């Protein structure tokens, strides 16, 4: 949150006379009570003569393309002559008699903009009438000239101090659980704790903010408001101001606080609502009362209902969105943004101020659903104090009458009660037990009361009732946190615990790490697949309706509307990564990912037990049963070349064989042996897909992806992939170390003629088994077909490497092992040895 230093120090200075600290100390104060600052910066400096002026005459110059005004401005004796200053200006939002801010020749404005006397538009211009953006108070959107009440200063007096140009803006990082701190009220409360100051709550005593509330005693209701239970809304209030001057502008002091907090001044009524929000943390909305017809109903929208918000976007609503409606239709998207139909305009004379307390989750979902984050929604989704609806309405009404005239109606609509805060029981010694620091009972009680809690003491037990603005305090651990942070986290000693003996990675963790290392060593780059996916990808793949991968688990509050289920396969995310990389000009790469997937399992409905104590075993069992099945999968994908052309020879494309080899690398790292079999499984090519088996049970697939699926998805042709259920592999606790031999190896080849239908992998496995203990490796290096071999016949040539661990092998021993392998192949497949 952006907030000016002078605002918070001014609020604190009301009860702590003379208190003032440097910006660096204020920054440290925020940090001391647990609030980081993203940074702080002074308002850019203006040097040279910057004075108040009074516009005496305005000459309209109409002979130019845009309207130009030649002004004579009274700047007193600041120009050295006492004569009126001649200034040419293009702004239109000031008139004769207005008090303005003038930079005279010799002044240098922010951005090194030097002011000098020069002729422009045929007139001499000796100075500039300044806007807020030119003085560094706002961005270029706030380009209007600053017009002031004459009480700010006489013509010729220095304007810096009166305008508050010697100030510093802080950007305070407010965490989601501390919504109360998105206001001057919340931040000054924290700073009072940081500097041991007296805090006066502006919601109780508005005088600390310079506001004297003047509203008539409440007599009756304004209009009827129906707050339907389905909306989960807590409170709703209305107050009316009638007969305001629609041309009135908010005063500079208010505009200044708004601009330094990142808000854009709009009109008097809107500026008042934004100021009250920044002061108290209560978002408000101003309706043009003339455009509101009949009673108001706060209800859930009908699916498909249309509504145009203040940002001129026509939105299609969801049945979970909460709306405020009158007889004419929807007037506001509750807690997020108002509508155009009842917007404050330059003809508005009667205003309804609305302040409410909305359900945090409902507002958060609506904001995310419509991609519409506003200052109001940021506060409502973090929690707003339900007890300040009345004072917010009264302050807003008071300020608007002061600014724009009119009267506050005696009627007030208020629906809903302030919810009772639930007391929390805590041992007074609990903070000391958790922090390892001795906190006295007096310290614990004082810190909790400083937060705003009511504390009842019974022996060594405290019954703590949180204040209405601290909805985040729900259990004793929250109270402990408050004591620790206010006493100073730096007071807690850093003690490294002694590691228990015999602990380390589990066997499953070791396997996961080994698999990751093996694939990285094989040249694959690791990515982190998304745990969410779009289920429509399975329609593109053409999966059957009963395919296991369609048993997805829906996400109630998805980050993206399209990716609304938990992934049952890593391939959709892996292929998205391929598509992104190819779009960026990377065409040759191979990736791998290790991630859990989730399959629907059990009841699917999780109970919501209290976190105050350990739930019963039956509840734990119900929780476990409701969880989805979450096996660990590993996947690889490759496209383009795996070897590049160069002086060493031609390059080689990544093929389905490489995808299968990646599965073998996983198996070796896991200490198991995979069996291969031909398979027809989507999204793979039916003729270039291998099933990965353990004891005859499929645990995954590898191969080239189906060309039609690749085309539909916009992926490169011949992209290959592998996915394997790592959790389905038997866990080998202690992988056997490889046997190393210092004796030389013998190499022999064998070629076997078999039927075309027999897989080469099956023949390879039989050759390895038949060769006995002396065989070290069996590798297929050639497949040959010809008329001489016969129809539906093929020749498979294998390279055999033999080695003994205790001696040098003879050719006779290797030949005998080779012949034994051929005999077993003949027995199993009727294979004939060639050559």
Swiss-Prot record:
It comes from the Bacteria. Residues 419-494 form the B5 domain. Coiled coil: none annotated. It is an enzyme of class 6 (ligase). GO terms for cellular component: phenylalanine-tRNA ligase complex. InterPro entries: aa-tRNA-synth_II/BPL/LPL, B3/B4_tRNA-bd, DNA-bd_dom_put_sf, Fdx_antiC-bd, Fdx_antiC-bd_sf, NA-bd_OB-fold, Phe-tRNA-ligase_IIc_bsu, Phe-tRNA-ligase_IIc_bsu_bact. Its cofactor is Mg(2+). Pfam families: B3_4, B5, FDX-ACB, tRNA_bind, tRNA_synthFbeta. Keywords: Aminoacyl-tRNA synthetase, ATP-binding, Cytoplasm, Ligase, Magnesium, Metal-binding, Nucleotide-binding, Protein biosynthesis, RNA-binding, tRNA-binding. Binds 2 magnesium ions per tetramer. Belongs to the phenylalanyl-tRNA synthetase beta subunit family. Type 1 subfamily. This is Phenylalanine--tRNA ligase beta subunit. It comes from Corynebacterium glutamicum (strain ATCC 13032 / DSM 20300 / JCM 1318 / BCRC 11384 / CCUG 27702 / LMG 3730 / NBRC 12168 / NCIMB 10025 / NRRL B-2784 / 534).
């Amino acid at each position: 949150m952006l907030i000016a230093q002078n605002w918070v120090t001014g609020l604190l200075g009301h009860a702590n006379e003379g208190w003032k600290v440097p910006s660096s100390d204020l920054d440290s104060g925020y940090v001391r009570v647990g609030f980081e600052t993203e940074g702080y910066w002074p308002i850019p400096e203006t040097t040279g003569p910057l004075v108040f002026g009074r516009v005496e005459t305005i000459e309209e110059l109409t002979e130019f393309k845009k309207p130009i005004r030649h002004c004579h401005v009274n700047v007193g004796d600041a120009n050295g002559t006492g004569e009126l200053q001649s200034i040419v200006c293009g702004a239109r939002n000031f008139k004769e008699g207005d008090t303005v801010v003038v930079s005279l020749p010799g002044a240098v404005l922010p951005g090194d903009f030097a002011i000098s006397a020069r002729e422009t538009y045929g007139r001499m211009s000796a100075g500039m009438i300044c806007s807020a953006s030119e003085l560094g108070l706002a961005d270029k959107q706030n380009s209007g000239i600053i017009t002031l009440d004459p009480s700010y200063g006489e013509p010729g007096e220095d304007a810096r101090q009166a305008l508050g140009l010697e100030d510093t803006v802080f950007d305070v990082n407010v965490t989601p659980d501390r919504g109360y701190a998105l206001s001057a009220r919340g931040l000054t409360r924290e700073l009072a704790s940081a500097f041991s100051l007296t805090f006066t709550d502006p919601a109780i005593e508005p005088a600390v903010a310079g506001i004297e509330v003047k509203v008539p005693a409440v007599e009756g209701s304004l209009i009827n408001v129906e707050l339907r239970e389905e909306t989960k809304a807590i409170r709703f209030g209305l107050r009316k101001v009638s007969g305001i001057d629609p041309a009135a502008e908010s005063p500079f002091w208010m505009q200044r606080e708004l601009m330094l907090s990142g808000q854009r001044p709009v009109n008097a009524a809107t500026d008042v609502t934004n100021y009250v929000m920044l002061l108290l943390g209560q978002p408000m909305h101003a309706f043009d009362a003339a455009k509101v017809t009949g009673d108001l109903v706060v209800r859930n929208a009908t699916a498909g209902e249309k509504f145009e918000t203040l940002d001129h976007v026509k939105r299609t609503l969801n049945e979970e969105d909460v709306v405020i409606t009158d007889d004419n239709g929807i007037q506001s998207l509750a807690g997020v943004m108002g509508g155009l139909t009842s917007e404050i305009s330059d003809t508005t004379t009667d205003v309804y101020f609305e302040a409410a307390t909305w359900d945090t989750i409902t507002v958060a979902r609506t904001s995310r659903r419509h991609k519409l984050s506003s200052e109001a929604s940021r506060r409502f989704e973090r929690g707003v104090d339900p007890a300040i609806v009345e004072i917010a309405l009264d302050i807003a009404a008071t300020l608007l009458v002061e600014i724009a005239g009119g009267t506050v109606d005696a009627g007030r609509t208020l629906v809903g009660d302030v919810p009772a805060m639930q007391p929390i029981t805590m041992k007074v010694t609990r903070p000391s037990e958790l922090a390892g620091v001795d906190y006295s009972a007096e310290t614990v009680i004082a810190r909790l009361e400083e937060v705003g809690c009511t504390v009842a003491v019974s022996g060594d037990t405290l019954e703590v009732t949180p204040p209405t603005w601290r909805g985040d305090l729900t259990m004793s651990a929250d109270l402990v946190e408050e004591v620790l942070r206010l006493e100073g986290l730096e007071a807690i000693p850093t003690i490294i615990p002694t590691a228990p003996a015999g602990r380390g990675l589990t066997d499953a963790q070791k396997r996961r790490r080994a698999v990751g290392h093996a694939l990285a060593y094989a040249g694959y780059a690791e990515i982190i697949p998304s745990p969410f996916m779009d289920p429509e990808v399975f329609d593109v793949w053409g999966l059957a309706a009963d395919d296991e991968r369609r048993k997805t688990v829906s996400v109630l509050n998805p980050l993206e509307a399209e990716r609304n289920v938990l992934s049952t396969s890593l391939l959709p995310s892996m292929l998205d990564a391929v598509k992104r990389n190819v779009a960026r000009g990377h065409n040759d790469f191979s990736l791998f990912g290790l991630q859990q997937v989730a399959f629907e399992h059990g009841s699917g409905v999780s109970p919501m037990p209290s976190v105050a104590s350990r739930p019963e075993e039956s509840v734990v069992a119900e929780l476990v049963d409701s969880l989805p099945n979450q096996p660990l999968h590993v996947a690889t994908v490759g496209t383009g070349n795996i070897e590049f052309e160069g002086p060493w020879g031609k390059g080689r494309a990544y093929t389905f064989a490489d995808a299968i080899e990646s599965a073998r690398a996983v198996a070796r790292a896991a200490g198991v042996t995979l069996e291969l079999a031909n398979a027809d499984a989507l999204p793979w090519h039916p003729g270039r897909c291998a099933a990965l088996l353990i004891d005859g049970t499929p645990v995954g697939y590898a191969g080239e992806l189906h060309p039609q699926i690749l085309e539909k998805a916009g992926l490169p042709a011949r992209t290959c992939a592998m996915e394997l259920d790592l959790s389905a592999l038997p866990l080998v606790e202690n992988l056997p170390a490889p046997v190393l031999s210092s004796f030389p190896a013998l190499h022999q080849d064998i070629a076997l003629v078999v039927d075309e239908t027999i897989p080469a992998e099956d023949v390879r496995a039989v050759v390895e088994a038949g060769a006995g203990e002396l065989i070290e490796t069996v590798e297929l290096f050639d497949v040959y077909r010809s008329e001489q071999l016969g129809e539906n016949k093929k020749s498979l040539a294998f390279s055999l490497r033999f080695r003994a661990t205790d001696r040098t092998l003879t050719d006779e021993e290797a030949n005998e092992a080779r012949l034994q392998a051929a005999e077993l192949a003949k027995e199993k497949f009727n294979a004939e040895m060639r050559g």
